[in-house]
């Protein structure tokens, strides 16, 4: 019987996905399709929770199938992150004119980053005090507890290393491994490696302009391809949101969702 209900739930999910595809063919705006996927996911998830319960075998098997869409979408997003970071940084640096611009840009980026972080922290503090928010009110599920345990292990690893050792981890000793996210500092290492490539192109530009021009054309072509891939992945957002929200609402207690909604509301106010 559980298998039958699982099949029914999967068929319903396919129908909802078909509805979103129909909306796309009717040229409904992207924003409306995303919010439609969000609303359908919430409704379908609550129906599953009401009909079977959060811990039922039917919900577990159904959400496993839903993950083909939801987790698949997240995986595709992760796929484009590193290539997008690399080509964006390389393209930005190699198109600068002179080292002074590079220094000014670096200083401006750091200044803007520090200012925005300070503003965000201040707004968060004021909002949390205004709403009297306490994260302890939200009970963590098995997934959250497992993630918290992993985070504690990572924090422990950081504490065991001195500051010089932590700084040395930023050096991309194996940039190809860092592109796979092999280390905790892989993303920053990729950024540094990409910056080195951009600066190297500026150096070659003075001595061998023809080779630099050839490399620029190649990077511009790769950049265009990566942006196209990003566009294709983002078009899947309504379907990914539908599957992810359905799984979340079907496997999370309503009381905890309501508590979390308070935090979400406060976040929008902030």
Regions found by a protein language model. Name each.
Residues 2-7, 21-25, 35, 74-81, ...:
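Signature of multi-pass transmembrane helix bundles
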Residues 28-46, 68, 74:
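Loop-to-helix transition at the N-terminal end of transmembrane alpha-helices
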Residues 143-150:
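Acidic, negatively charged sequence tracts
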Residues 58-77, 177:
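Hydrophobic alpha-helical membrane-interaction elements
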Residues 37-55, 116-122:
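A generic, lipid-embedded transmembrane alpha helix
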Residues 9-21, 42-44:
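Hydrophobic core of alpha-helical transmembrane segments in multi-pass integral membrane proteins
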Residues 58-65, 103, 254-262:
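Membrane-water interface of transmembrane alpha-helices in multipass transporters/channels
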Residues 1, 18-28, 51-54:
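Short, hydrophobic transmembrane alpha-helix segments
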